[in-house]
């Protein structure tokens, strides 16, 4: 009889982490590369897109919303750092759960991480496509709508374009991109007329296949394939590529902070608490729950544990340094954005770009577009790294077919087969699926992983207090009986999970049920830990 909660011995985990050779991952990443991977994973859509919606929920208090998110992620990050230093093995939260909560919980968290990494990469590839299309417009190049989005999004985009043109013609006095303009467009879209629908179909001009209109996000498909190829070639090359991209991205963010500060009017931040936070603490919390996506990705650093030169020292540095850097940059951009433009007038679709356009600095928008492209590219890179390393760890434990998911390329020393599979799936999903259908699942999957890692730290402090810990999560007293930091991590991230709504919970539960079918039909029969336990019982 299999023990569903059989834990993977820490001694076995540590010995596996020390294995080297042509069939194992190559250790080439130092603290700078790991920090760059963390920054690369985090800074992306959140800072270039979601800040606008966050501002309309919190006003200038958006700065505190980013601080709140940063604090919640720091609690989880400190727990990740303890595990990453103690268990330097690819797999991240999956490996940590295996050592503390048992095999079934480990499988659940590994399956859950697919929502964060693979679906996150698909979501970001779609967002990358939007900025790439804007980038091409700088050079006068336009891609047909049906090749720029999935069919549903392309039709929606065409309808929005028609509505915007109608508002421009009917109300030329309303500034394009202002809240009043967006409200007028939204009013038209509530009940689209037959004339609008016909004009949208004409604008879309999509070809038909077997009588069905085609929609295929070609840029999203191609960028996912390009990132996949880079990852197959090698982690060292991927790290160099990511470092270059992160340099560009951070430079653009610093440009926004330095150049944008010249246009800040302190009065836009308000004169008291009520004008600084027009919707109070509730508004700040609501914005924090929404912009949480802006912090997703730092945990991917721990999935590269077997490729770090000195994981016990470098992984905590990479995790904590990347979180600190990103939080500072986010708060700074929020301050500049809400200082440049009154929060009521901040553009929702492209807030930073339009903030400069409002001050007649149009050339800056081109620079920001380049920064957004760089940001989203590095996010995709790190998310795909994270997914492939989790699958590698699960296959090494026998929970997935090892010959495929743990196959290491003899030349590049990367898990090339599962990288190609994950990249293809991410490319296909990102090219044919509306971004809103997959994006909301990413947050809840990530938050579940954070909660379980915080809980696992508490459990391991009590069950294995003498295990060497090169880095210790602070704020844990009396052998784990008073876990202040992990406890706050559970409460903070659990609250954010609660705020995501019932349908996200339903989708998460359905996804986990599918995973349980896979576990009981295949994984439990091939588990390395279960086989070792059976041998021990036989003796």
Positions of predicted regions on the chain:
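Membrane-interface loop-to-helix entry segments
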Residues: 129, 215-263, 278, 319-323, ...
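Membrane-helix boundary/coupling elements in multi-pass transport proteins
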Residues: 48, 112-130, 290, 295-308, ...
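Membrane-interface "cap" regions at the ends of multi-pass membrane proteins
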Residues: 1-51, 55-61, 74-78, 87-90, ...
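A generic transmembrane alpha-helix motif of multi-pass inner-membrane proteins
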Residues: 57, 440-441, 445-446, 478-539
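Extracellular loop-to-transmembrane helix junctions
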Residues: 26, 47-160, 322-329, 506-511
